[in-house]
Amino acid sequence: MNSTHHHGMYTSLHLWNRSSHGLHGNASESLGKGHSDGGCYEQLFVSPEVFVTLGVISLLENILVIVAIAKNKNLHSPMYFFICSLAVADMLVSVSNGSETIVITLLNSTDTDAQSFTVNIDNVIDSVICSSLLASICSLLSIAVDRYFTIFYALQYHNIMTVRRVGIIISCIWAACTVSGVLFIIYSDSSAVIICLITMFFTMLVLMASLYVHMFLMARLHIKRIAVLPGTGTIRQGANMKGAITLTILIGVFVVCWAPFFLHLLFYISCPQNPYCVCFMSHFNLYLILIMCNAVIDPLIYALRSQELRKTFKEIICFYPLGGICELPGRY
């Protein structure tokens, strides 16, 4: 087994390794046909320590988000419950990827034949990662629908999005995504699974784009209608628009971090022997790093966009003996 194949194992996902393994074969074929033998065909190596470090950072950040939302009753709203679901999904994707890197590195450093055990561990962790990816997509869609209701059905919103209903939605999301993730890994040898994942990703983008075009085109009209009513409708509507903008940023980061991976899958099933596709697929490990970066960036977005969340973060952090961090100015 050559070194590049060992490096490819750090990416691990059984479903995703399948495309990585195919990459080496296709690269060899391309080289055999006379193409340049530049480093573009070599699988990009990323140190396992990078995966582990990002996994630990993501774990700490997203736990902080979950604890903050649970602790502060002012954050007990549908949007933040969906954000909590997204934080759990982000954390599982990043931590599972880092954990699998550790497991494979340890197994590769031993002389014993642990191939069967490695495959079983891969399947379990890959199921978690796949389920979490689906949950991330569904959570983002749920937040988008929630923002849509707050803007277009502001007066009926609290009757539509009750805490009980939100809890049922989140439970159904995770139940469906868990079953789907397990099935995807079981049938990961089929190209239909990859096509299904790619279709889900791009369908999500189309739905989001359609929703936001309608949302922002009509938002001003609804703001004007709410403004003529007594009370604090204008203030409430402004807060709702801020939430919609926050979601826009989250979706933008999600697309930037996940699109290269889905393009990798798309190229694998559409042009696996094309030298340009092979060159793009040789950076597979980098695309996994981008995925883990998404889990690290999202909590920072929550904090930057929510003063209430920043305040709760500080209260939680100051609970621990972290030196003079509590002496920082109250203003962010």
UniProtKB/Swiss-Prot annotation:
SMART domains given in the database record: 7TM_GPCR_Srsx
Species, as recorded: Rattus norvegicus
Domain of life: Eukaryota
Extracellular topological domain: 1-43, 107-123, 187-191, 272-280
Cytoplasmic side: 70-81, 146-165, 216-248, 305-332
Disulfide links within the chain: C40-C279, C271-C277
Localization per record: Cell membrane
GO MF terms, alphabetically ordered: hormone binding; melanocortin receptor activity; melanocyte-stimulating hormone receptor activity; neuropeptide binding; peptide hormone binding; ubiquitin protein ligase binding
Described function: Hormone receptor that acts as a key component of the leptin-melanocortin pathway at the intersection of homeostatic maintenance of energetic state. Plays a role in regulating food intake: activation by a stimulating hormone such as anorexigenic alpha-melanocyte stimulating hormone (alpha-MSH) inhibits appetite, whereas binding to a natural antagonist like Agouti-related protein/AGRP promotes appetite. G-protein-coupled receptor that activates conventional Galphas signaling leading to induction of anorexogenic signaling in the hypothalamus to result in negative energy balance.
PROSITE patterns per UniProt: G_PROTEIN_RECEP_F1_1, G_PROTEIN_RECEP_F1_2
Gene that specifies this protein: Mc4r
Name of the featured protein: Melanocortin receptor 4
Residues binding Ca(2+), per UniProt: E100, D122, D126
Alphabetical list of Pfam families matching this protein: 7tm_1
Record's keyword terms, sorted: Calcium, Cell membrane, Disulfide bond, G-protein coupled receptor, Glycoprotein, Lipoprotein, Membrane, Metal-binding, Palmitate, Receptor, Transducer, Transmembrane, Transmembrane helix
Stated family: Belongs to the G-protein coupled receptor 1 family.
GO cellular component: cytoplasm; plasma membrane
Family annotation (SUPFAM superfamilies): Family A G protein-coupled receptor-like
InterPro entries named among the record's database cross-references: GPCR_Rhodpsn, GPCR_Rhodpsn_7TM, MC3-5R, Mcort_rcpt_4, Melcrt_ACTH_rcpt
Transmembrane stretches, start-end: 44-69, 82-106, 124-145, 166-186, 192-215, 249-271, 281-304
Membrane disposition: Multi-pass membrane protein
Main location: membrane
Positions annotated as glycosylated: N2, N17, N26
